Design a protein with these regions (language model features):
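Metal-dependent catalytic neighborhoods of phosphoester/phosphodiester hydrolases
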Residues: 36-46, 181-188
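Active-site neighborhood of phospho(di)ester-bond hydrolases with catalytic His/Asp-centered motifs
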Residues: 1-5, 21-33, 49-54, 103-107, ...
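Active-site-proximal loop/helix segments of hydrolase catalytic cores
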Residues: 87-164
């Protein structure tokens, strides 16, 4: 479970009810739209809580808590986690388990904002491409990446740059902060074969392909 924020449909409980799969929580940083301390309620069920070190969470089972910073790699059983950087707070996660690789960007994105000073936007661009240059994995099974509506015309800049560097079998749009993302003609022209999942509402579920 990455960056548990809110679950109005109680989907997590439903998914866990009849599942014997191991449960891991990942928290990329402390922002309220990425970190909900209510994740403690699954403390007995969860195998581990893997979090950026800027997240404060008290637990009865402190041994289940693992704090990371960008550059760290952690192995728990058959799970290998590498934390990459962010262009806001915290970090991003690359997770390998059971022959599958998942990337979750957290707040890693090309944060270009209309109306901000040009120097700030240029610095944001530089920081984003610097983080991308660190990625060694060129193919992943699933990638979760922001497409933030508040960025207006720059909404797709980050995800398109990411897709130039990494080829995910499935791209999951997240962090919409407004109107649901509908890929532009330019995006579809550049990436006509890219499989997408763009959730329509909180609680949407997609069955993963084996």
């Amino acid at each position: 479970v990455f960056d548990f924020y809110k679950d109005p449909e109680n989907r997590l409980e439903t998914l866990l009810k009849d599942s014997k799969k191991k449960l891991y929580f990942f928290v990329s940083h402390y922002h309220a739209d990425h970190f909900n301390r209510d994740i403690r309620r699954w403390e007995e069920r969860a195998e581990a809580y893997i979090m950026h070190k800027n997240c404060w969470l008290t637990m009865d089972r402190e041994e289940k808590k693992h704090l990371m910073v960008p550059g760290d790699t952690l192995t728990i059983g058959d799970l290998t986690v590498t934390m990459y950087g962010s262009t806001d707070e915290g970090g991003s996660f690359l997770v390998k388990s059971g022959g599958k690789t998942i990337f979750h960007a957290g707040d890693l994105n090309w944060w270009h904002w209309a109306g901000e000073p040009a120097a700030d936007n240029l610095a944001a661009r530089r920081d984003f491409f610097h983080e991308l240059s660190r990625f060694s994995e060129r193919q992943v099974d699933v990638a979760f990446f922001p497409v933030d509506a508040r960025q207006q015309a720059a909404r797709e800049w980050g995800v398109m740059a990411y897709l130039e560097r990494v080829e995910p079998k499935l791209l999951v749009a997240m962090h919409a902060f407004g109107k649901r993302w509908l890929p532009s003609y330019e995006f579809l022209w550049h990436y006509p074969e890219q499989k997408l999942w763009i959730p329509e509402k909180d609680g949407d579920v997609k069955e993963a392909e084996s």
